[in-house]
UniProtKB/Swiss-Prot annotation:
It holds the Pfam family Pro_isomerase. Highly expressed in leaf. Gene3D superfamilies: Cyclophilin-like. It catalyses: [protein]-peptidylproline (omega=180) = [protein]-peptidylproline (omega=0). Residues 223-248 are annotated as: Disordered. GO terms for molecular function: cyclosporin A binding; peptidyl-prolyl cis-trans isomerase activity. Binds cyclosporin A (CsA). CsA mediates some of its effects via an inhibitory action on PPIase. One of its GO terms (cellular component) is chloroplast stroma. This is Peptidyl-prolyl cis-trans isomerase, chloroplastic.
Length: 248
């Protein structure tokens, strides 16, 4: 576990057990980072994936991500009920658009939270906020629109809401999931996986998938970051966000 977080994570170590060496197999090291929110920590935990076996995907259909990396395939685990876009700027320059399909039939409350924060229908939300934490070969994390550094954010239901379902899994690049501080502590922070992350299953609520612009996700993933807190050295901004027509 990363020493810089060791003091902060005493209370949450029981949530994600450390992976140890198995006889005859390489050691797999975990290091968990987090961000503080109302005396708790919202995080997407870090774990090397070099020795992880691929998670089995439960899919309803398969699509090739438009504008994604060559040969990249996205597995959609549920019906897309709405589409959200993020127009991304890196270092003040346009980097392109990410389009996310949301699984409203599977996790309606979680999707409604994300969709409302994306459209700004309540007067606050993701537009103008930043991806505050990036870990290569793992995930990019954002959604803190109050502080911009991982210490804030709020849901449309109040500061926190419950884990709706763990039926959907972290099957690969493009999976959208909620960051949390343990059971039933969802707010506004989210992360997008850049690799399969099966150790997050049954701990974080999956509620969508990148269906266009995975190359933009990869641009974000490739940014140089601080060794202290994995924050990108160039600002990675959601310059504009909103909802798209489902058939558009």
């Amino acid at each position: 576990m990363a020493s810089s977080f060791s003091t902060q994570l005493v209370q949450s170590q029981n949530l994600l057990p450390r992976f140890h060496a198995v006889q005859g197999k390489p050691h797999v090291v975990s290091s968990i980072g987090c961000s503080k929110l109302s005396s708790t920590y919202h995080y997407a935990p870090r774990l090397s994936v070099s020795q992880q076996s691929k998670a089995k995907s439960i899919t309803s259909r398969r699509i090739t991500c438009a504008s994604g990396a060559q040969g990249e395939v996205a597995e959609l685990q549920a019906k897309v009920t709405s589409k959200i876009f993020f127009d991304i700027e890196i270092g003040g320059e346009s980097a392109g658009r990410i389009v996310i399909g949301l699984f409203g039939d599977a996790v309606p409350k979680t999707v409604e939270n994300f969709k409302t924060l994306s459209t700004g229908a309540k007067g606050y939300g993701y537009q103008g906020s930043f991806f505050h934490r990036i870990i290569p070969n793992f995930m990019i994390q954002g959604g803190d629109f109050t502080e911009g550094n991982g210490t804030g954010g709020v849901s449309i239901y109040g500061s926190k809401f419950e884990d709706e379902s763990f039926d959907l899994k972290h099957v690969g690049p493009g999976v959208l999931s909620m960051a949390n501080a343990g059971p039933n502590t969802n707010g506004s922070q989210f992360f997008i996986c850049t690799v399969p992350t099966p150790w997050l299953d049954n701990r974080h609520v999956v509620f969508g998938h990148v269906i266009e612009g995975l190359d933009v996700v990869k641009q974000l993933e490739s940014q140089e970051t601080s060794k202290l807190d994995n924050s990108p050295k160039k600002p990675c901004k959601i310059a504009k966000s909103g909802e798209l027509p489902l058939d558009g």
